[in-house]
Amino acid sequence: MRSQNDKATWSILRFDHRTFTAQLASMQKNKQIAAIPEKYIYIDDCCYKGNGKIKEIILSSGCRIIGKEAFASCQLRKPVVFPQTVKEIKESAFSENHSLREVTFPASLEILGDYSYKGCTALKTVAFETSSECRRIPECCFHSCTQLSKVVFPEHLKSIGRRAFYRCKELKEITLPDTLEEIGLEAFYFCGFETIVLPKEIKKLDQRAFFGCKKLKEVYIPENIMYLGEEVFHGCNWLEYLEIHHDPEHIGSKIVNKNCTIRCKKGSKVDLYCEEQGLKREYI
């Protein structure tokens, strides 16, 4: 599967005879159910964008790519059933669907585009099927999905992008896969976590990754983490302890509030950091 950034390839496929276009979609503009005929395997950019009448989509059994903003600002009420042929959902494909409540991605999905479900304010459940090919949750993917409360991540996930779950305030508990290596800038900004267990292999927590997660009480930093970004746990008002047994290569400023105690080894780089930042510490 070629990259979602391969614009040249997609510009050619958009004119393929197997591509369902916005012109074809306009013939269904007054229908509540949009059914993509079987002969079409690509859905063009902006195909149904802004069509508030359509409540349900039936994809063709061989569908492979869903284009940019293809179903943006529709009001889908029924979950979209993705066939096991779907490889890519492009940027903003389902953004601003305020009635969509759940989504299950097929194991075949490799690429999920930036902003693809941004602003889906009724979305409660997101799940990736077992053995999912998806390795990355992209930038702003579920940004402002304010009712999102359950996420089942891909088994082989490597990274969570910038603001992927920004302001998902009902997201109180997640299980991150062991394969995860990086959590991006403000990825879980103002989420509702009460606990968080970071996987052992994780290497980077970018700036403000968990900023404002006010109900967090205690976090252990695994020893493979080499980068702790600025204000990574700042604004976590209930956070009592941040435990760091090793010395990351980079520790940004203000990683926690002043009322939080950092548990670390005496004489360590983290110990010196606490002294410089005026943070409380407790030796382990």
Model-derived features: positions:
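Short secondary-structure boundary/capping segments
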Residues: A25-S26, S253-K254
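A structural signal for leucine-rich repeat
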Residues: K118, T130, H143, F211, ...
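Consensus positions within tandem repeat domains that build extended binding/scaffold surfaces
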Residues: L24, D45-C47, G67-A70, E91-A93, ...
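A short, structured beta-strand/loop element
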Residues: F20-A22
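Short polybasic/polar patches that bind polyanions
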Residues: A72, Y189, E275
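Structural signature of tandem-repeat unit edges
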Residues: M1-R18, Q28-Y42, G52-I65, Q75-E88, ...
